[in-house]
Amino acid sequence: ACVFLARQGKSKTEIKEYVETTFGYNLNRTCDEIRPDYHFHVSCQRSVPESIIAFLEGTDYENTIRLAVSLGGDADTMGAIAGGIAEAYYGGVPDDIQAEVLKRLPENFIDVMQSFYDRFVLK
């Protein structure tokens, strides 16, 4: 829902209100409030809201991912969730980050990513 709303040009406030109302998540905490007591948890109820909070608090794509990862716990998943929302909201992955990632990936991964992006994202 967050990625869809971000792609529709909704504000962070609108995204927050929709998620709170629709899914019942408490998004009124800050990353600083979450960080001291947060630990790995396999439940989406303990990683998705925190990832969304990192997005809401983030100031750009990279800052959002850094905030999500800084929470600890299931950091790779949370970075992916927050980063996905940030990519949609901020209009893409910054060129410097994208270039660094692409040079580290096998060509077949890049082909699959480009096909997916062309088919589902650029529409």
What residues fall within each predicted segment?
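Catalytic phosphate/nucleotide-handling subdomain of diverse soluble enzymes
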Residues: 50-123
